[in-house]
């Protein structure tokens, strides 16, 4: 008699995705981040659902409802901080996942990669709208500044901004619709993740060598399911350490002040995981130019499959490209630091240089180094 997990229509799908899935025998811990992101997403949906039970999306009560969650709801503080810091952990893993994809040439699975980039945009949008919900000073002013960027769009910009606001400023209508979008988007993201996995399982996983691994596959369970559980333990340890010891480490103190449209904070900045993009936005004096640079700083990821000129897929055996990738990582850390600094003398020029080098490394230096490596190997 055939096994139920191989015959039942629904269980068969799960079986082919997580149990009998043929996986390369040599994939490293860098391949753990996909499943970790899935766990993060589930955690965010669960904690978010419980927060939504107590939160009120109204300008007069939003701030006090968050205070009520932390003070009066059973373990409300835990749920709230797990959700807030869960977002930070989510982005750390997202950036690792993308970095792994660039290093090992996983972007050559074009459909999987492009859906991944769309997912990144959706997660960023969700996180931004979530940051607005507590209705603190940074929530209000962050929403005002970022939504205002759309006014740079020629002809239809100002109308578009008022349409998003639902009025002539960020107010009750804006908060209500942001809550609605913040609630629905994670479910759309979950559906997109399934499509992401569907395309990945069409080709099978890449591996550190970048070579075809069809001749050497092992079942996902028990090998990688056990390996992933180890990753989950580390993730839980990191998240609990953040939540229980320093829950406000990555937050902004200004957000503990209720939103006040009459009082602008001295320095408006987004959450730490958007600072690199914010630095690129600020480095261009022109409004439309800054917005375009901001969008292209993420959209540039879609160009990776087109710009791949190396004869080798992975960077494992390409020292020049490896160096450039780590310079790019250092550059992104500098941009993140600059995004959190005030707009004054040394920081402005550092931000501009880091922004130029970000685009130069990806668009010029990386393809050039790949071309040189080909020549050195007489390919």
UniProtKB/Swiss-Prot annotation:
GO cellular component, one term: mitochondrial inner membrane
Alphabetical list of Pfam families matching this protein: Cytochrom_B_C (PF00032), Cytochrome_B (PF00033)
Sequence positions that bind a ubiquinone: 201
Highest taxon of source: Eukaryota
Positions bound to heme b b566: 97, 196
Subcellular location: Mitochondrion inner membrane
UniProt cofactor(s): heme b
Signal peptide: none
Keyword DNA repair: no
Record text on cofactor binding: Binds 2 heme b groups non-covalently.
Recorded GO MF terms: metal ion binding; ubiquinol-cytochrome-c reductase activity
Gene Ontology BP annotations: mitochondrial electron transport, ubiquinol to cytochrome c
Topological type in the membrane: Multi-pass membrane protein
Principal subcellular localization: mitochondrion
Keyword Endoplasmic reticulum annotated: no
Listed transmembrane segments: 33-53, 77-98, 113-133, 178-198, 226-246, 288-308, 320-340, 347-367
Keywords: Electron transport, Heme, Iron, Membrane, Metal-binding, Mitochondrion, Mitochondrion inner membrane, Respiratory chain, Transmembrane, Transmembrane helix, Transport, Ubiquinone
InterPro entries for the chain: Cyt_b/b6_C, Cyt_b/b6_C_sf, Cyt_b/b6_N, Cytb/b6-like_sf, Cytochrome_b, Cytochrome_b_C_euk/bac, Cytochrome_b_N_euk/bac, Di-haem_cyt_TM
Subunit record text: The cytochrome bc1 complex contains 11 subunits: 3 respiratory subunits (MT-CYB, CYC1 and UQCRFS1), 2 core proteins (UQCRC1 and UQCRC2) and 6 low-molecular weight proteins (UQCRH/QCR6, UQCRB/QCR7, UQCRQ/QCR8, UQCR10/QCR9, UQCR11/QCR10 and a cleavage product of UQCRFS1). This cytochrome bc1 complex then forms a dimer.
The protein's role, per its UniProt record: Component of the ubiquinol-cytochrome c reductase complex (complex III or cytochrome b-c1 complex) that is part of the mitochondrial respiratory chain. The b-c1 complex mediates electron transfer from ubiquinol to cytochrome c. Contributes to the generation of a proton gradient across the mitochondrial membrane that is then used for ATP synthesis.
Remarks, miscellaneous: Heme 1 (or BL or b562) is low-potential and absorbs at about 562 nm, and heme 2 (or BH or b566) is high-potential and absorbs at about 566 nm.
Protein name listed in UniProt: Cytochrome b
Organism field: Isothrix sinnamariensis
Gene that encodes the chain: MT-CYB
């Amino acid at each position: 008699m055939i096994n139920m997990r191989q015959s039942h229509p629904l269980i068969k799908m799960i079986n082919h995705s997580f149990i009998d899935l043929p996986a390369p025998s040599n994939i490293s811990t860098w391949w753990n981040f996909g499943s970790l992101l899935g766990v993060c997403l589930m955690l965010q949906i669960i904690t978010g659902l419980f927060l939504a039970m107590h939160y009120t999306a109204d300008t007069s009560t939003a701030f006090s409802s968050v205070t009520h969650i932390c003070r009066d709801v059973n373990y409300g503080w835990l749920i709230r901080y797990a959700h807030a810091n869960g977002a930070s952990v989510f982005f750390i893993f997202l950036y690792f996942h993308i970095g792994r994809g660039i290093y090992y040439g996983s972007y050559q699975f074009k459909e999987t990669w492009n859906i991944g980039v769309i997912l990144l945009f959706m997660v960023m949008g969700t996180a931004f709208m979530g940051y607005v919900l507590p209705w603190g000073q940074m929530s209000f002013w962050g929403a005002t500044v970022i939504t205002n960027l759309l006014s740079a769009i020629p002809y239809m910009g100002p109308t578009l901004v008022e349409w998003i606001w639902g009025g002539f400023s960020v107010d009750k209508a804006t908060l209500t619709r942001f809550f609605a979008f913040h609630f629905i988007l994670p479910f759309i993201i979950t559906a997109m993740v399934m499509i992401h996995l569907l395309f990945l399982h069409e080709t099978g996983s890449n591996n550190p060598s970048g070579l075809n691994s069809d001749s050497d596959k092992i079942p996902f369970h028990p090998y990688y399911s056990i390996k992933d559980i180890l990753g989950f333990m580390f993730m839980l340890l990191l998240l609990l350490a953040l939540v229980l010891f320093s829950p406000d480490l990555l937050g902004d103190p200004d957000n503990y002040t209720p939103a006040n449209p009459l009082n602008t904070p001295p320095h408006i900045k987004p959450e730490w995981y958007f600072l690199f993009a914010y630095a690129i936005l600020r480095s261009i004096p022109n409004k439309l130019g800054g917005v375009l640079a901001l969008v292209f700083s993420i959209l540039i990821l879609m160009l990776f499959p087109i710009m791949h000129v190396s004869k080798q897929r992975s960077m494992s055996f390409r020292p020049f490209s490896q160096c450039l990738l780590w310079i790019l990582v250092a550059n992104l850390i500098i941009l993140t630091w600059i995004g959190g600094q005030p707009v004054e003398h040394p920081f402005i020029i550092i931000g501009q240089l880091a922004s130029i080098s970000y685009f130069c490394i990806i668009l010029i230096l990386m393809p050039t180094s790949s071309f040189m490596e080909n020549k050195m190997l007489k390919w």
